[in-house]
Structure formats: structure tokens, C-alpha cells
């Protein structure tokens, strides 16, 4: 069997190597923003260029490049595309049944103001879903709901991507932080605590920024009390839970606290001027729907919350472990020609020796978020009284609408894994470590690049965690700070990740318009990560005592 040892400076000059490694990303940017290509075309060109660079510059065997491409494409299909298919199917069932109109009226009974609706659904409810399931599902569900409530598709998708910034670090029950902590050998609570301190200000800022994007400073002034309640309750709960409970629950706790606090506050206060993004006059005629009908209308999303809570319980997860009752539903397919035949080298491994890693495609039929959402959709068919023939028609319609987004997601993940397994992405990160004292400014950018490439804060943390730690040790910086910078920088890259862009466009019916959405979010993402670099530098050199020490 062939072995491949990753080379991080193939051209003998780290900056020249980094320039070559940057070419596929630049091509993706240009394809979307300048040439205005569809998402799948931009992704195909980027993965093709990365494959050529992997073979010709990084000397990766062609067969390994092919296997990396296939592994990434399959991972894009399952579990990621499956999550989005199930989420959109659930939403469409609600619309098909007619009960979504009742749900819409009940939401509008809380407030008719679109600015506050985006905070309640995109920020609060989206954060809860991110804290529980992650993987792009929150963006798909919340963006689709906002379109149903009257916001434009591009607006809904872009605002939900920005709203998703605050909870990503603690997404999927804290896996981004706990996985990195395990990989680098530091207590997860320390990274969680530092992340909570930094994200306190991000979480305070994001809701106000969303309102600003919708209606400028006038909008902030008109909605300040409600937005402040949402932002402060979220940031406060996130800070306390991340510092005292660990990384698993802050995403869920902060979202629920903020959602309840804001909804209760709106019982007693409403903005004097009701803002509608569609320009229509705000009007609401109270319907005489029986309370039971309102409960039925909300039932798909209530059941979704309950099933998600069940899915993350330890006793339920134990059913899928070896010899568990449902272990038969887990399938494993090892890619023999790359599994344990690709070797990472220092500084991406702590030892002085190269280290290989397994490459196994995990096809979990039941123990995956997409299946949990699909199960909710099946239950909702009964509750909403949707006929089987209608449900099958809706599912077929969903698959038809998703065919290009599925292709885009698959190609994006192929690009990610070709870049990761060849060493291309590692070259970019390694170049930034050569900035010496300015490394604190570029440290969040490494996490940002990682999430742009992989679409996942967890993957970015696993990919670059050791590099952040070892560079901090070499430069005598607090390693908890650079590890946190990787996590937080990653959250700021989520809004422009090709995977996230494809998911958001699919959810709101903008497949093929990925360039428009990318153009909407990229400028804010770049500004935010630059500001975060300044914040990390200020902490490192002015107030390092706020960083938890490893004991």
C-alpha cells in the first residue's frame, strides 16, 4: 500500500507555498462574486484546482486524491445533505397541511415587527437548534420559517447566517470545544470559559447588528428594549453556563433563556412603529382558531425539540454503541488506500514522529440528526393529517428542489477533504504562524479558514488545534487563548462557508444564487474576524490574566 506523508512547504518558501495553497479559495471567491457562477460550478472548479495542486505540488498519489474526493462527497451526502432534506421536508409538510398559516398567525400575535421576529426565530430559536443539532439544520429550518412569515429569501438566508454566529462554538452539544480539548489534552472547561468570555460581547452585538442591517440606527432605537432583553439574557446565560457548566449546554440554555425572556417581555411592550421588510402595512386580525388547532400547528416544532432532546441523551446514544440494541443500524466503510496511510507531521502532531489517522465513512442510519428530523416529519404527517400520497409528493418535490444544492454540498466537502488530506489547508495555517508576535492577530483567521474549508467548527478545531497550541507554547502565549481564538474565529467563518451558503440557499429556494448570498455575508465576516484578531491581541498583551491557566 502507498503511504503519503504530508508536506507543508512543498516549494521551499512557506509564503510561496501558501500562495499556491490559497489559489482554490481565491478561485471560489472569484467564481461566485465576479463570474457569478452557480454554487456547484464554483465548487467543482475549486475542487478540480485543489486536486491538481495536490498531485503536482504536494505529490499526493492520484488514487489518494480520488479517495479523498469520494470520501468528502459521501460525507456531504450523509449526514449533511440528509439533514437539510429532512428539515425542508418537515417545513413543507407544515405548509402543505395549511397549519403553517395558523402557526404564522400565532407568531404574529407575539409581534408583527419583522426586526424582532428575526431575533426570536433566527437568533433565539436558531441558537437552540444549533446548540442541539448543528450541521446546518438550524439555518435551513429558521430561514424557511422566516420566508413563510413574509421576509424575502435572500434577507432570511443572510440574516440567519449572521445570527448563527453566536452559538456555533457551543453547537451540537459542545462538540467543537470538547473534541479539540480531547485532541490537545487540556480541560474542556478552560476553553469553554474563555470562549464564553469572548463571545459575551459577540452575543451582545449580533442581535443589534441584525436589526441595524434591517433598519439602520432608527431600527435599533425603536426596538432597543426588546433587542437588549434578547441579547443580554442570551449573552449572560451563555457566559455563566460556559464558565461553570462546561461546553455541552451553553448553546441550549442561552437560547431558551433568551427566547422565553424576550417572548414574555413582548407581552408588555411593543415597538411604536411596526417594521415590515416587505413594505406592506402591518395588520393583524385576531383569528378565532381553537387553542387545539394552535397546538397542532406548533406540534411539528415542539416534537422536533423533544426528539432532539431524546437524541442527545446518554442512554439513547448507548443504544448505538457496540452490542447496543440499535448497533445494527450503524455501518462502517473504511477507505483502505488512505485510512492510516496518510501521515501528518509536526507541528500538526505533538510528537516528533509522523502520525496516521483512520478514514472511515460512517453511515449511521438511525443515529444521525437527519433521521431524527425525518422521524419528526413522519410523526407530523399523522398529527397534521397529511395524506401519505401528499407527503410522498412533498418529499419528491423536496428532492427535486435539492438536487443542485446536494451536488454543491457534496463538491464542497470533496474540496474540503482533498485540501485537508493533501496538506493544502495546513500550509495556509502554518504560514500564519510565521507572523511571530502578530500571530495573536492571525490566530482567529486560522479558525476562520478552517471553517471556510470544512464548514465545521469541530473539524477546524481538530485540524488546527495542535498547531495553535504548539505555536502559543513556542511564542510564550497563553495556549488557552489561541485555542479559543481558533474556535471563535471559526464561528465568524461559518456565515461564508460554502457548505452553509449552499444549505441556506437550498432552504429558501435560491439554489443557483449562492453568489448573491456570499456577497451579502463575506464583507461582514472579514470585518468581524479582523476585529477579533485585535481583541485576541489585546487580551494576550494587555490583560493576559483573564485567560484561565492550565493547572
Residue ranges: model-predicted function:
Residues 95-100, 112-113, 146-155, 182-189, ...:
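Juxtamembrane helix-boundary/capping and inter-helix hinge elements in multi-pass membrane proteins
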Residues 281, 288-446, 450:
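Transmembrane helical segments that form the transport core of multi-pass membrane transport proteins
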Residues 137-145, 161, 174-185, 430, ...:
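Re-entrant/interfacial helical elements at transmembrane boundaries that shape
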Residues 9-23, 76-80, 133-138, 189-204, ...:
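Structural signature of hydrophobic alpha-helical transmembrane segments
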Residues 66-152, 385-471:
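Membrane-embedded alpha-helical segments and adjacent helix-loop junctions characteristic
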Residues 2, 169-279, 488-551:
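Juxtamembrane and boundary regions of transmembrane helices in multi-pass small-molecule transporters
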Amino acid at each position: 500500500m502507498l503511504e503519503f506523508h504530508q508536506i507543508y512547504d512543498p516549494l521551499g518558501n512557506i509564503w510561496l507555498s501558501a500562495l499556491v495553497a490559497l489559489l482554490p479559495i481565491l478561485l471560489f471567491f472569484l467564481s461566485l462574486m465576479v463570474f457569478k457562477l452557480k454554487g456547484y460550478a464554483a465548487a467543482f472548479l475549486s475542487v478540480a484546482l485543489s486536486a491538481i495542486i495536490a498531485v503536482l505540488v504536494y505529490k499526493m498519489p492520484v488514487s489518494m486524491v480520488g479517495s479523498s474526493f469520494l470520501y468528502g462527497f459521501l460525507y456531504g451526502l450523509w449526514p449533511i445533505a440528509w439533514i437539510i432534506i429532512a428539515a425542508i421536508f418537515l417545513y413543507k409538510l407544515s405548509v402543505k397541511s395549511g397549519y403553517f398559516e395558523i402557526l404564522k398567525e400565532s407568531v404574529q400575535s407575539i409581534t408583527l415587527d419583522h426586526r424582532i421576529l428575526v431575533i426570536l426565530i433566527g437568533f433565539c430559536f436558531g441558537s437552540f437548534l444549533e446548540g442541539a443539532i448543528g450541521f446546518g439544520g438550524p439555518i435551513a429550518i429558521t430561514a424557511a420559517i422566516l420566508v413563510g412569515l413574509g421576509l424575502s429569501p435572500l434577507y432570511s438566508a443572510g440574516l440567519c447566517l449572521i445570527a448563527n454566529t453566536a452559538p456555533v462554538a457551543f453547537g451540537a452539544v459542545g462538540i467543537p470545544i470538547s473534541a479539540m480539548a480531547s485532541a490537545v489534552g487540556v480541560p474542556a472547561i478552560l476553553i469553554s470559559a474563555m470562549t464564553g468570555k469572548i463571545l459575551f460581547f459577540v452575543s451582545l452585538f449580533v442581535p443589534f447588528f441584525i436589526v441595524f442591517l434591517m433598519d439602520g440606527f432608527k431600527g435599533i432605537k425603536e426596538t432597543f428594549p426588546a433587542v437588549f432583553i434578547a441579547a443580554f439574557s442570551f449573552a449572560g446565560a451563555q457566559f455563566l453556563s460556559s464558565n461553570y457548566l462546561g461546553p455541552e449546554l451553553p448553546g441550549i440554555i442561552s437560547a431558551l433563556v433568551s427566547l422565553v425572556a424576550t417572548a414574555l417581555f413582548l407581552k408588555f411592550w411593543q415597538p411604536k412603529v411596526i417594521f415590515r421588510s416587505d413594505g406592506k402595512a402591518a395588520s393583524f386580525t385576531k383569528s378565532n382558531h381553537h387553542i387545539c388547532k394552535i397546538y397542532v400547528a406548533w406540534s411539528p416544532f415542539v416534537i422536533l425539540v423533544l426528539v432532539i432532546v431524546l437524541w442527545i441523551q446518554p442512554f439513547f446514544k448507548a443504544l448505538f454503541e457496540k452490542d447496543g440494541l440499535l448497533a445494527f443500524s450503524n455501518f462502517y466503510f473504511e477507505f483502505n488506500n488512505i485510512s492510516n496511510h496518510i501521515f501528518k507531521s509536526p507541528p500538526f502532531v505533538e510528537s516528533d514522529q509522523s502520525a496516521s489517522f483512520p478514514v472511515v465513512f460512517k453511515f449511521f442510519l438511525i443515529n444521525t440528526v437527519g433521521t431524527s428530523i425525518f422521524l419528526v416529519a413522519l410523526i407530523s404527517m399523522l398529527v397534521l393529517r397529511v395524506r401519505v400520497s401528499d407527503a410522498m409528493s412533498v418529499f419528491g418535490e423536496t428532492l427535486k428542489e435539492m438536487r443542485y444544492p446536494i451536488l454543491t454540498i457534496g463538491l464542497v466537502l470533496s474540496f474540503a477533504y482533498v485540501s485537508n488530506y493533501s496538506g493544502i489547508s495546513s500550509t495556509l495555517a502554518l504560514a500564519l504562524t510565521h507572523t511571530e508576535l502578530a500571530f495573536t492577530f492571525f490566530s482567529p483567521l486560522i479558525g476562520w479558514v478552517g471553517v471556510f474549508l470544512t464548514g465545521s467548527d469541530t473539524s477546524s478545531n481538530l485540524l488546527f488545534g495542535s498547531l495553535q497550541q504548539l505555536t502559543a507554547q513556542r511564542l510564550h502565549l497563553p495556549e488557552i487563548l489561541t485555542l479559543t481564538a481558533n474556535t471563535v474565529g471559526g464561528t465568524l467563518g461559518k456565515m461564508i462557508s460554502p457548505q452553509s451558503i449552499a444549505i441556506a440557499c437550498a432552504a429558501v429556494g435560491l439554489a443557483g444564487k449562492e453568489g448573491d448570498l456570499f456577497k451579502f455575508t463575506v464583507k461582514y465576516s472579514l470585518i468581524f474576524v479582523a476585529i477579533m484578531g485585535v481583541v485576541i491581541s489585546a487580551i494576550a498583551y494587555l490583560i493576559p490574566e483573564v485567560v484561565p491557566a492550565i493547572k
